[in-house]
Every structure is written in C-alpha cells, then in structure tokens.
Amino acid sequence: SPLVHLTLNLISLSFVSIQFDDKQYYKPKFPKKYPFSFEVPKYSELERIDNHLNLNFKKYKAKLHISYFSLENDLKRHTESSRRLAFKHTSKANSISEIIYQNDERNVYGVKFDFDGSTATSTQFFLTDSSNHFFRGALYFNTQKSDSLAIIEEYLKVDVTRIIETFCWK
C-alpha cells in the first residue's frame, strides 16, 4: 500500500491517526552556487531563502533548516558554533547523543546530534570536508512539543540520516 497507517493511543479512549508516506527519495537540482547534493524525500519541499535552504515537511508540520558556509580557515569556529547551538538544548533534553559520521570516499565528515526530551529540535547535524565547505541542518517542528510527536520525530530522523548518507560535494 502507498501509505503506512499507524494509530496511536494518546490518552485513554482518545486516538489519532497518522498516515505516513512511503520512503521514496530523489536528488533535487541545486543552484550552481551550492557545492553539494543529497537525496530528499518525495513528500518534502525544498525552499530556497537567500543563502539558506529549508526542507519543508508540511504534512508533518516540520522543517529542516539548512545553512551552508564556505570555509576560510574557520572550521573550528563553525564546528564550535554548531555544538553550541546543539547543546543550547541541554536544559530541556533528557539526553543528547552524538553520532560521528565519516565517509572518506566522498570526503564528508560530521556529527549528528539526536535529542530526547522536550527540546525544540529533535535532531541537528553538521557536515564538512574539513577545508572548504561546511553544511549544517536542524529539524524543528511548527507546533508545540508533545509525546504525540515522538513517532513523527523518529520517522523524520530516518530522512535526516538519508540526507547525511547520500551527501556529497560537487
């Protein structure tokens, strides 16, 4: 079936039905100024805003906010800034896990931060080639954080992982 159907019991005798799309991906055409490519889910919409991109998951009321920077001997500044932005959520997080990513063949290295708890974001990451490029993403929901979002967060984290795994520099 084209849709996966899941029913969650949120509160006794109260149910919500969520229709998840099949996981299908494609590689969008990025403007030449962006020296990277990666796969995105077909149910997302790529929005270009100045030097930033958003990957909009309208159905799930979420956006992956994306930033790209050319490095000018400032890798440390960008990695520290990304870590600071991630750990800004420490007070609300039950835990923050760091997953190191390394793909020598594609010259892509980075860290993914997964948050558990009542944080504004459920996952953030950065990717770099360590010399010329720095790419950062942060997933935010356009709604109040609640336990009912947990299943959607996990569903979209799969997409973030796919972006990281298919990411390459041009």
Please state what every model-predicted region is.
Residues 65-72:
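Extracellular-facing segments of soluble proteins and assemblies that are Gly/Ser/Thr-biased and enriched
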Residues 60-65, 134-138:
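Glycine-rich, often proline-containing surface loops adjacent to acidic residues and nearby aromatics
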Residues 83-136:
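Signature of long, low-cysteine stretches enriched in small and polar/charged residues
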Residues 1-62, 75-79, 87-88, 93-105, ...:
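N-terminal targeting sequences that direct proteins away from the cytosol to non-cytosolic compartments
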Residues 73-75, 129:
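Poly-acidic low-complexity segments
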